[in-house]
């Protein structure tokens, strides 16, 4: 998982999710696009 200051959707399968006030990008098709905003 990459930790970035600004997260973007890198492909059409990416979804931006907010959990406990933290933004995440999850991608079931291509898990290497996972990101977290820090």
From Swiss-Prot:
Q: Does the keyword Ribosomal protein apply?
A: yes
Disulfide feature: none
Example GO biological process: translation
Task: Name the SUPFAM superfamilies on file.
Answer: Ribosomal protein L36 (SSF57840)
- Per the record, the domain of life is Bacteria
- Keyword rRNA processing found: no
User: One MF term in GO for this entry?
Assistant: structural constituent of ribosome
Q: Which UniProt keywords apply?
A: Ribonucleoprotein, Ribosomal protein
One GO CC term, this protein: ribonucleoprotein complex
Q: Matching NCBIfam families, A to Z?
A: PRK00831.1, rpmJ_bact
Q: Which protein family is it in?
A: Belongs to the bacterial ribosomal protein bL36 family.
Record protein name field: Large ribosomal subunit protein bL36
């Amino acid at each position: 998982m990459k930790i970035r200051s600004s997260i973007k959707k890198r492909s059409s399968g990416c979804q931006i999710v907010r959990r406990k006030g933290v933004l995440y990008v999850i991608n079931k098709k291509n898990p290497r696009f996972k990101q977290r905003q820090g």
